[in-house]
Structure formats: structure tokens, C-alpha cells
């Protein structure tokens, strides 16, 4: 088995919700929930938080994870790549898990790791679309080849269904990524793409430069904390047993 690291990028100064990783959720910092759930995933050798903030680093260690202090980074993926270089031993597979997903299901992490067993360089997840989601720009859609590799990701409703109604071929993207350590370095060295800029979707950089992304299925719907209202909803879901 290859050495697998889950690296969670987290910064204090989020514009919409400053201090989000340290926000209290059921008696512990939000970032602690992400660390603890990632540790429950099978096949994970190390869970680390990549951050430029000592307070977040302390919370990560208190939750049982590693903390890696990084410099200023343009994107979370850049922060993950820097952290991966600092880990010893160096991981062979790196999972980029967002630090605002306190309800992440360990099975979703296992699914994206499992997709890498086919020898691919990069993988992500998708789930069935719920009713009405096809038209929502906040929900990123993905269509794939027969091989399971992504053809395109878009905020637009893809594919268009000539017969009308929502296409059964459309799926919702779930933003968890796995990379080989070597391809993570390649990816972060690539110039941002034009379509990436138009859609504001970083994963399009790989497709624009001719690299494949394997897309695996998951039942996890994804739930990121972007606002204090989202945090209240997460509190309710945890209280209900999520």
C-alpha cells in the first residue's frame, strides 16, 4: 500500500468568516471535527493541517493531527503542496480535504483514495444531483467519459438535454481531491487556465493542460461552512446525529 496523507488547508483570515477554523462547533474547534473524521478513514497514514496560523496549528495538534506551518499561498492547493514537501516520510498519495467540512464522511475519503488504485494521477468525487440542482450555479456539475475520467466541470447546467428535463448523466461535483505527490507538484506549477478563470474552478487547470481527472462516486453530499448561518446548521445536524 502506498503512503497516504490527508492534508487539510486552513487559514484564519477568510473574508466571509474570519476565524472560521477555530469557530466553536459542539464544544470543539471546527477544524478539530475535520481532523478527527479524516483520521477515521481507512487507508490513511497521516492527517495534517497546513496553515499559517499558530492557533489553528495548536487546535490541529490537540485533535490528534499534525500541523505544518506554511507561508502565504495563492490557493489551498498550493498550501497543501508545500505541506506535503515538509512531511516525513514523504507521502505518495496526497488527499486535499477542505478545512470547512466538519461533517465529512470517512467513506468519501476512502472513495477518492480508492480511485487512485487504478494508477491515475488525480481523482475527485461526484454524487447524484438532487432535484433543482442542475440550474444552480453554486452546484458544480461534472460529466465524464466512459472511462470515468472527467470531460468537463461547470457551474452551468451540463449536459443540455435536447428532450427536456434534467439529464441522468449530470452529477454534482464534491470537492475532495487526491493526487500522486509527483502530480501535485506538476499541477501547482501549471499556469492557471482560461476556463479555470471563467468558471472559477481550479480543477479545470488540469483538463486545460491535457491531464485526466478520475471521478469516483460517493453518497456524501458535501457540506462546507462558509457563513455563521452554515455553522448553526452544522450544529443542528450534529445534534441530530450527523
Swiss-Prot record:
InterPro entries: Cytidylyl_trans (IPR003329), KdsB (IPR004528), Nucleotide-diphossugar_trans (IPR029044). It comes from the Bacteria. GO terms for cellular component: cytosol. It is an enzyme of class 2 (transferase). It is found in: Cytoplasm. One of its GO terms (biological process) is CMP-keto-3-deoxy-D-manno-octulosonic acid biosynthetic process. Keywords: Cytoplasm, Lipopolysaccharide biosynthesis, Nucleotidyltransferase, Transferase. GO terms for molecular function: 3-deoxy-manno-octulosonate cytidylyltransferase activity. Its EC number is 2.7.7.38. It catalyses: 3-deoxy-alpha-D-manno-oct-2-ulosonate + CTP = CMP-3-deoxy-beta-D-manno-octulosonate + diphosphate. Activates KDO (a required 8-carbon sugar) for incorporation into bacterial lipopolysaccharide in Gram-negative bacteria. HAMAP family: KdsB (MF_00057). Belongs to the KdsB family. This is 3-deoxy-manno-octulosonate cytidylyltransferase. It comes from Anaeromyxobacter dehalogenans (strain 2CP-1 / ATCC BAA-258). The lineage of its organism: Bacteria, Pseudomonadati, Myxococcota, Myxococcia, Myxococcales.
Amino acid at each position: 500500500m502506498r503512503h497516504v496523507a490527508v492534508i487539510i488547508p486552513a487559514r484564519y483570515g477568510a473574508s466571509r468568516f474570519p476565524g472560521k477554523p477555530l469557530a466553536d462547533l459542539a464544544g470543539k474547534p471546527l477544524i478539530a471535527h475535520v481532523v478527527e473524521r479524516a483520521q477515521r478513514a481507512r487507508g490513511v497514514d497521516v492527517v495534517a493541517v497546513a496553515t499559517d496560523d499558530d492557533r489553528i496549528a495548536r487546535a490541529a495538534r490537540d485533535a490528534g493531527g499534525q500541523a505544518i506551518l506554511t507561508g502565504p499561498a495563492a490557493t489551498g492547493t498550493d498550501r497543501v503542496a508545500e505541506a506535503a514537501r515538509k512531511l516525513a516520510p514523504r507521502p505518495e498519495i496526497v488527499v486535499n480535504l477542505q478545512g470547512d467540512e466538519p461533517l465529512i464522511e470517512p467513506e468519501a475519503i476512502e472513495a477518492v483514495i480508492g480511485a487512485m488504485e487504478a494508477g491515475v494521477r488525480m481523482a475527485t468525487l461526484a454524487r447524484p444531483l438532487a432535484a433543482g440542482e442542475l440550474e444552480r450555479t453554486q452546484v458544480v456539475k461534472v460529466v465524464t467519459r466512459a472511462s470515468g475520467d472527467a470531460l468537463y466541470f461547470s457551474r452551468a447546467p451540463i449536459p443540455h438535454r435536447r428532450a427536456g428535463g434534467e439529464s441522468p448523466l449530470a452529477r454534482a461535483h464534491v470537492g475532495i481531491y487526491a493526487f500522486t505527490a509527483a502530480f501535485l507538484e506538476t499541477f501547482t506549477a501549471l499556469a492557471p487556465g482560461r476556463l479555470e478563470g471563467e468558471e472559477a474552478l481550479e480543477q479545470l487547470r488540469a483538463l486545460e493542460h491535457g491531464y485526466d481527472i478520475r471521478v469516483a462516486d460517493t453518497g456524501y453530499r458535501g457540506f462546507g461552512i462558509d457563513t455563521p448561518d452554515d455553522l448553526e446548521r452544522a450544529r443542528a445536524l450534529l445534534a441530530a446525529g450527523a
